Amino acid sequence: MNNNDVYLGNPNLKKANTTIEFTEDNIREFLKCKEDPVYFANNYMKIVSLDEGLVQFKPYDFQEKLINNFHENRFNICKMPRQTGKSTTSVAYLLHYCVLNDSVNIGILANKAATAGDLLGRLQTAYENLPKWMQQGIISWNKGSLELENGSKILAASTSASAVRGMSFNILFLDEFAFVPNHIAESFFASVYPTITSGKSTKVIMVSTPHGMNHFYRYWHDAERSKNEYIPTDVHWSEVPGRDADWKAQTIANTSEQQFKVEF
């Protein structure tokens, strides 16, 4: 790929209408990834590690289960402790969805616009490190949104009715939904729910650490009792390799028992 084919001087991105020749191996891999988002995450998703820099994402068992749940079900609700890789796992699926499906719209919404922007930033880093034959050409690439040559678009914003009014999404990803004030959560769902139910394959993924009695609690409570369509996934802190009784004792010693109960 020569310099004329890169997007706005970024050598990690190809611009729209760039010709790439696929090998037979590329085609096989592309089809395999399209069928299996866990295979895609294990082989093509790069993340930035605090200790090692840019590394290949290797999901834990519970993260693979989450990705499969996102893929196989329309409505997912996930109750997860801090630092269990919930953002990375979610981004892996959203990246798979936008690259390997044409003309899809994804909304990444969080309790704060900066948090949503950070999630999109992680997705963009992973995208830049995909092989060029797997990338779509770039139409637009911004801090709060992107558009790919295959027609797929992603918007990152704070969770509010005004952020999504008049728009339709194939996936709505709601991060830290338990931290969205009740009145905002209520008006948000009143505004967006008709557009979700108008499609037969639209998805809602709700992920949060618990935070009191609120909309997230109600959705979770109803999901556990099969009173709504959400598939509940509860991740325990001990499911992360290396987190055992000693880790718990050390974490409590460095913080407090109360803080551990809140965050884990």
Predicted regions located by residue number:
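Phosphate/NTP-binding elements of NTP-utilizing enzymes
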Residues: 2-264
